[in-house]
């Protein structure tokens, strides 16, 4: 099931060897969070390379960087892959200690669970609540992703449960198969990038609106011209009196 579909061009561009060749765009910083073995690393690599790799060593928080084009705009995208040892029974303090740095750093979030692992689904709510605690203004976009949608025979989390949770939290929900559908994976990251860009633009508009324009100060040429005009007027007045 795909509750959301996106269209438009979204192309990967290699990172230049020398950053001096480019005027680097504003960074977009995303974090992918979730329990272990839900496919976070596979999602990121699938998006960046179009390749699906099923088995990964437990990660310790790898950071991926790419220049990408979103609807014709070049952006510097960074994606933080987070450690996956978080389960619903873990204490809040354990979760905060392991993820707070990434949550503070990122501007947009993917919360990933596996439809074959109900405990990974249960970890989504505390992750969401922690993000909102760190970003209390509620502006940071958060998407909930049910991964491994191709493993229907092993499903433990129904689609309506993902939708219900997303509705309760006020988040967007997608159910995808990283292994079978690259386009769905691309749509997830593409749409999240667009939401982060939207937040940036709204913030910029508010800052511009709050700035009071300074009165234009006369420059030296203006002052000289006015001085000459004053002298000329004074001379004409003197001649008329004589």
UniProtKB/Swiss-Prot annotation:
Binding site for GTP: 34-41, 81-88, 147-150
Top-level lineage group: Eukaryota
UniProt keyword list: GTP-binding, Hydrolase, Nucleotide-binding, Nucleus, Transcription, Transcription regulation
Gene Ontology BP, a term: positive regulation of transcription by RNA polymerase I
EC number(s) given by UniProt: 3.6.5.2
InterPro entries hit by this protein: P-loop_NTPase, Ras-related_GTPase, Small_GTP-bd, Small_GTPase
Region (Small GTPase-like): 17-241
Chief location category: nucleus
Catalytic activity: GTP + H2O = GDP + phosphate + H(+)
Transmembrane segments: none
Localization in the cell: Nucleus, Nucleolus
Gene Ontology cellular-component terms listed: nucleolus
Family annotation (SUPFAM superfamilies): P-loop containing nucleoside triphosphate hydrolases (SSF52540)
Family statement: Belongs to the small GTPase superfamily. Ras family.
Purpose of the protein: Regulator of rDNA transcription. Acts in cooperation UBF/UBTF and positively regulates RNA polymerase I transcription.
Quaternary data: Interacts with UBF/UBTF.
Protein name, as recorded: Ras-like protein family member 11A
